[in-house]
Amino acid sequence: MSTVSSYFMGISSKKNGSSATANKQSTRPQESHHHRRQQPTSQQSTEMNGTTTAPSGGTSSGTTTTSSGVPTASTGGGSARYSSSSSGRSHPTTGGGSSSHARSSGQSGMSSRSAARRNDQDVHVGKYKLLKTIGKGNFAKVKLAKHVITGHEVAIKIIDKTALNPSSLQKLFREVKIMKQLDHPNIVKLYQVMETEQTLYLVLEYASGGEVFDYLVAHGRMKEKEARAKFRQIVSAVQYLHSKNIIHRDLKAENLLLDQDMNIKIADFGFSNTFSLGNKLDTFCGSPPYAAPELFSGKKYDGPEVDVWSLGVILYTLVSGSLPFDGQNLKELRERVLRGKYRIPFYMSTDCENLLKKFLVINPQRRSSLDNIMKDRWMNVGYEDDELKPFIEPPKDQIDEQRIEKLIQIFQLGFNKATILESVEKEKFEDIHATYLLLGERKSDPSRYSRSSATATGPSITSGAALASAANAQKHQSSAAPASGSSSSRRSSQNDAAASGAGGTVVMSGTRHGGVQMRAQPTSRQAAISLLQPPSYKPSSNTTQIAQIPPLFNRNSTATSSTNQPSSGITAGTRKIDPKGRIPLNSAAVQSHRTATGAVAANTGGIPSQRDHSQQQQQYMNQLTSSSMMSKLINKTPAAGGANATTSATSAAAAPLQKSGSQISHAPTEPVIREDDDESNSEHQNGNVPLIGGVGPQTSPVVAPSEDVTSSEQQKQEKASSEAPKETKPSMIHQSPSMPPSQMMTAMESLKLSESGGKSPSNSQQPPQRATSQQMSRSATTNSAANMASNQQSSGAPQQSGASSQQCHTKPSSTSSSSSSSTTAPTSSGQPHHQHQLTHNASFSVTPSAYQMPTTTTITSGAPTSSSAFPRNTRNRQTFHGKTEKDKGGDDGSDEIGDTPANVSIGATGASANNTEGTIWSKLSKLTRRDHNRESMTQPVSSRAGTIGAAQGQQTAAALAAIREQSSGPLTPGTPPVAQAMTQEGDVKPRSLRFTWSMKTTSSLAPDDMMREIRKVLDANGCDYEQRERYMILCVHGDPNTDSLVQWEMEVCKLPRLSLNGVRFKRISGTSIGFKNIASKIAQELNL
């Protein structure tokens, strides 16, 4: 699930800019392992199980064709031949006679470069011309391609099957099998499947509008009219899935894509499964903020009801721009979800509120079905003549004769009408069927396939002159031209290859190898500014090696990054630009690129050097920090834990709009997915699934991070260890392409030290180890700044990171209080990779190992590096997928004690834990009413934590089960003493509000005097209250057994424009009239 980690990095996506110098003219060997360069073994491909088979290599002469006469890997219309140069590289060549890239010594360098550029652009797979690479990962890469017959753009995912174990292959083919059954206008389409012994090609629908998540980040919450239009499409698509006995199980804003017309496309069916009445499922998968209560409770479920709950969370997110349930760790989120309490924004209509109450029902038996939801009043406002009804799929035997006639003309030399009709009627998902499907799609703008749009794909931040040239080049592009998307791995939450463009993202939602998922990621805001290269730009040669897919996965995707950027095996990407180019930008120099639509951060052949690129990128990113794109930081109130109680302050330095989560220490080469026996059904007997055997030993994705533990916390651990012993296995740290050997050794040493430190309090005071945040793996967190954390926090000073430090109060998202202790501190380095990351899809992005410890152990993480689970501006796309039963422990030897993010701590429940108030509100843009000291701070971009992957699902579920045992009693939130919130009296100040027209009660008294007066009046009126922060009180009045119960909060705020202080009233629950009555009475009685 989303907040529990980035463990599952099966296809950790890589921004194409990482291979900046890996073009055809580069002198660096692109492949050092010659055995990966496989020669073609056949001239003709065959058809396997209704799947077109593409050859894995080129031929020595002629054009390789499939059974349907389709060239599969041709360049320039000729044959694709691979000759080895002296540097050990393979070069595709064209022409009738020459098989060498360097034809003669007398040939000019200019003509050679032109030929190389022509070859790069003319690579074909089947009937698709590959335009550019838009995503790379450990096991797959994604190419933006153009169907040569219809001219439509598609996204081709190229998957290395040899890197997958049989279980992962089963999950992959189950996903493909499900996608083949789907035909809905709001679900991503699968057009074609091509397969060789080593490679699987999936041709998927391309969507250029990006993700709904990024739309919300760019524009803030939707008006209800706009949200209704989108939500009707979502409900229609999910109801269609349920009608076919399919559940999605990972519905969230990140998996909702937009096409060029801003229509919804549901993506990512990696966790989908079929269901049947009577056969309950028990796999806990999805994203925690979107997960239904029964998943947290460990109960089995039928299926559709978990999707219905997720739809309720999505509706709330669309209308409010925030999540209804939030928390700083899994335990806190679980409590809030199980209570089912959420805030209703004042601007939400009554009809929308009533509809939410049908979705967000704790008892799954009482949750409405989607058939009833479709009849709801809010769903049909403005659609009285078009009431939402279940989608009726067109009959399979309904054939479009016009398209058939076109197919006959197209394939007249190879197939007769009977063969064409058979392919279409039987839905073979091969060339003929794919062409038939694409002929039915709306034709795209041909201008987007121009040479300028095909070549201007560099992701670098270019100079002003280059930007001017790019601006001229983009005049020839359509404003609706799509931008590149990126592929992301289920097993990677941090390395999302973000490719940018105003058009949005590529819809790579279709498939994932069990945990290897190439979902479309939103394109990067920063890369969107870099966008176009001058017309002379030459794309990287990695687009020419389609016939040698295996080397592309492990060589090109990591070799250059490990050379140029030791910190990132998967190059950091940046956030996308708005689909329609409406994002406010501070730099006038980049305004001309707001319509850069065809630009894609794909290849980086024209970049002088990676160092120059990074410097230019940093310079532009500093200019592009936009307040409307930032989410607020939080400063949790200090914990009153006795003499050793430490305070927590989050730094608030201005953060560049880029991803810093390139530190991936666990890049597995063999994804492992465990699932329920009752869920891995007949697919295991599917004859179409090749069981790959003989796969060499692979490194384990499990990485045991080190611990940062203070002396007082270690004493608690020692006491708790007698009750719940833990296992620590330093050997579970494994080398990966993204962690250089020197960093790996540092991680190993720190882990050993932390392991021994768990038994000796003195060991926790060892000197901090040098750990550069950009180079350290996120799952191998060292105590690089533990001493600095303890020193600064014990003195009560806010932690510094970057240029400034501020404190910000964040109100809890529900009336429940957290019961965890947390200590945060910035990295020792001055990198702009800040530790406190606000997440949307899981605002507490926590790695699963953080929840694999016994819940009686309190772990306080100090001094996180940017490898913490809150990577700034990084999409933590994690999907939790595993058993929910306590006794189903993992067999992969993962640690019980995992890495604990900077601001996340799993503490002992009950009185033994320090109650710490505050929660992370993943505010999207334009939601600034909770900003603290807005005049003196900038806010971080809300990053996303996605869904939790498969390999650690069982351990996380076991941790949840342990939490359930401890929380077996009624969920009564512990009320922290007022003294606890007062530890930093001298440092905490009231929030400053810029807009004061809604402030009815003002005073010139000191804030503390106002708080005393408020408490006195509340006592006089018989109101129950809880002081959540120093200047905020949560109030309750009325009888909980009747409808008269009202909850609201009162906060003392500064009004700088009036030079006064004010009291802010905010209704949380209860009727409006009831709130107005009690609020007016209290306001009148306040003697301020």
UniProtKB/Swiss-Prot annotation:
Region (Disordered): 1-121, 466-524, 556-581, 602-622, 638-953, 967-987
Domain UBA: 398-440
Task of the protein: Required for cytoplasmic partitioning and asymmetric cell division in early embryogenesis. Phosphorylates and restricts the asymmetry effector mex-5 (and possibly also mex-6) to the anterior cytoplasm of the zygote. Regulates mes-1 expression during early embryogenesis. Critical role in postembryonic vulval morphogenesis.
Active site per database record: D250 (proton acceptor)
The keyword Acyltransferase belongs to this UniProt entry's keyword annotation: no
Required cofactor names: Mg(2+)
A Pfam cross-reference name: Pkinase
Keywords (A to Z) from UniProt: ATP-binding, Cytoplasm, Developmental protein, Kinase, Magnesium, Metal-binding, Nucleotide-binding, Serine/threonine-protein kinase, Transferase
Taxonomic source organism: Caenorhabditis briggsae
Reactions mediated catalytically: L-seryl-[protein] + ATP = O-phospho-L-seryl-[protein] + ADP + H(+); L-threonyl-[protein] + ATP = O-phospho-L-threonyl-[protein] + ADP + H(+)
Protein name: Serine/threonine-protein kinase par-1
UniProt binding sites for ATP: I134, G135, K136, G137, N138, F139, A140, K141, V142, K157
InterPro entries registered for this protein in UniProt: KA1/Ssp2_C, KA1_dom, Kinase-like_dom_sf, MARK1-4_cat, Prot_kinase_dom, Protein_kinase_ATP_BS, Ser/Thr_kinase_AS, UBA
GO BP: intracellular signal transduction; microtubule cytoskeleton organization
Annotated localization: Cytoplasm, Cell cortex
Gene Ontology terms, MF aspect: ATP binding; metal ion binding; protein serine kinase activity; tau-protein kinase activity
